[in-house]
Amino acid sequence: MQTTPHTPSQAPPSLVDPPPGKAPNPNLGSLTGIRFLALLPVFLTHAAFEGVFSDAKLSWGFLDGMGSIGYTSVSFFFVLSGFVITWSFRPTDTARKFWRRRLFRVFPNHLVAYVFTVVLMLAAGSAFDASGMVAQLFLLQAWVPDPLFIDTGNTVTWSLGADVAFYALFPLLLAAVRKIRPSRLWYWAGALVLVVIALPTLALTVLPDSPAMSVGGVSRSQYWFTYFFPLSRAVECVIGMVFARIVLSGRWIRLPVTAAAALVVVGYVTAQQLPFLYRLSAVPVVPLALLTASLAVADAEGRGTFLGGRRMVWLGELSFAFYLVHQPILAYGHVLISPRDAGGEVVPRTWDAPAGITLIVVAFAVSMALAWLMHNGVEKPAMRRWSRPRRRAAPPGPAGAAAA
C-alpha cells in the first residue's frame, strides 16, 4: 500500500485544475450519501434526550450508549462543509454568486422549519423565549455565550448560524488557502488541528468555571466557546478546505476508505477516555478529515463506495431537511402526547421498551416524510428559482435583421 503523498505529476487526471469556466471536479456521491449515516447518531442522541422509556436503567443506558457520537457527527458536518464547498467552487464564481447560492440553500428551509417549530410550540403550550426565538430566526443565537439561550425552539439551527458565519468568511478564507504552496498543505492541516485542540484548553484555562452545565463538568461559557461559538467551529471548516486542496493538488496519501473509517472508530474510542470538551471535536477531527478526503478520492477516481449508490445519495439529499425537522418533532411531539399535572406543568410520558422504540421509529418516519416534502417542495424549487440570477434577454437586433 502506497503511503507517500502524490507529487503534482501523480495527481489523478480527474483532479487536475479544470479549464476556466468549468466546474472544478466530479460530483462526490459518497460524500452525499454519508450525510445520512452521519445524521442518524444525531437523531438517536436527541431521541435519547427525550427519555421515553419508563425503565430508568434502559433510558439512561440509551443515553450513555450514544456517548458523544452525536458531537462527532456534528464535527464531521463542519469538516465536510469546508471540503465540499472548496471542491465545488467554480473558477468563474464571485463572492456575490457564492453568497447567493448559500443564502437560498439555507434560508428557505430554515424559515419553513422555523414556522413549523413555532406551530408545534403553540400546540404544545411550550414557553417562548422571545429574544432567543428572534435570534434564532436570523441564525444569530450561537453568538450569545450561553448554551441555555440557544436551547429554545428548533435548537439544532445553532449549527446553521455557525455555517452562515463560515460562508460569510469563505471567499477570504479560500483566497488564503489557495495561497498555500502544495508542499506546505499538510503542515497547515497539522497547525489547524492544533488550533482545534487548543480551543478546549483555552476555554478551561481562561473562562470562568461557573455557572456549571448539568453534564460534562464544565461551565456554560466553556461549553459554549468550545462547541457553539461560530468562529471556533469555523476552524473545522477550514480544515476541510485544506484537505480539499491537498487532494486537488495531488498531495493526498493513498489511504483506503476502510482504513480511514477504522481510524474514525479508533479516534472516537480514544476520545471517550479524555475530558468532556476534548471529546467534542479535538480528537475526532483528524480521522474525520481523512475519511472525507479518502471518500472524495474514491469517487473522483471512479472506484466509488456503497455510499454513492442511488438510494444512499437520495437519503443524503434529504439530510438537510431531515436535520431541521427532526428535533421539533421529537421534543414538542413528546410534549403534545404527555399529560399535565394539576398546576399545568408537563409530565413527560414514558413507555415500556417496545412502545418506546415504536415511538422513536414513528418519529423517524414522520421526520423522513416531512424532509421529503421540504426537500421537494421548498429546497429544490428555491434553489432552481433563486440561487442563480436570471440571464438577461439578449437585446433586439437592428430593425431589418429579421427581414434579412
Give, region by region, the residue ranges found by the protein language model:
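Alpha-helical transmembrane segments of multi-pass membrane proteins
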Residues: V42-F53, P200-T201
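Functional transmembrane helices that form membrane-embedded active or gating regions
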Residues: A23-L40, W99, V106-F107, L160, ...
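Hydrophobic alpha-helical membrane-insertion segments
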Residues: P41, N109-L122, W188-P200, S281, ...
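Hydrophobic transmembrane alpha-helices
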Residues: F83-R90, F170-R178, G240-L248, A289-E301, ...
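C-terminal "closing" transmembrane helix and its immediate cytosolic amphipathic cap
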Residues: M1-K22, M312, Q327-A404
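Central hydrophobic cores of alpha-helical transmembrane segments in multi-pass inner-membrane proteins
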Residues: F76-V84
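Aromatic-enriched alpha-helical transmembrane segments of multi-pass intramembrane proteins
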Residues: G29-T32, G70, A135-N154, W158, ...
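Transmembrane alpha-helical segments and their boundary/interface "anchor" motifs
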Residues: L31-R35, I69-S75, W87-M121, S131-A135, ...
